[in-house]
UniProtKB/Swiss-Prot annotation:
GO terms for biological process: translation. NCBIfam families: PRK05309.1 (NF003698), uS11_bact (TIGR03632). It comes from Rhodopseudomonas palustris (strain BisA53). One of its GO terms (cellular component) is ribonucleoprotein complex. One of its GO terms (molecular function) is rRNA binding. This is Small ribosomal subunit protein uS11.
Length: 129
């Protein structure tokens, strides 16, 4: 019984001109996901997947490197224009946005979609250093 050769599944090239970049910047990491208008993921990257570990993940430079990586992947699918949705309190928000603009995307709109509680859950304790 010979084992069947496993097929290598290639990503099909979608030809999408415009999309939405979701930049989620927490205190620990920055993730950037590029979707089409329906919300289907086309490309994603994060500071952690780019090889940054620990406290280096939360730096603006790590967010910039992740944004450059995800923009390269999205441009392979023919993407040219982006709407940017920024969420979270982290330090990688602006640098990720600048890196997306520098990669050659036309940014049509920038929205801050950070969730703000109307006095919901109790927040974590204050940090004393």
């Amino acid at each position: 019984m010979a084992k069947e050769a496993t097929r290598i599944r290639r990503r099909e090239r979608k030809n999408i001109a415009s999309g939405i970049a979701h930049v989620n910047s927490s205190f620990n990491n920055t993730t950037i996901t590029i979707t089409d208008a329906q919300g289907n993921t086309i490309a994603w990257s994060s500071a952690g997947t780019m090889g940054f570990k620990g406290s280096r993940k939360s730096t603006p430079y790590a967010a910039q490197v992740a944004a450059e990586d995800v923009s390269k992947k999205a441009q392979e699918h023919g993407m040219r224009t982006l709407e940017v949705e920024v969420a979270g309190p982290g330090s990688g928000r602006e640098s990720a946005l600048r890196a997306l603009q520098a990669a050659g995307f036309t940014v049509t709109s920038i929205r801050d979609v950070t969730t703000i509680p109307h006095n919901g859950c109790r927040p974590r304790k204050r940090r004393r250093v």
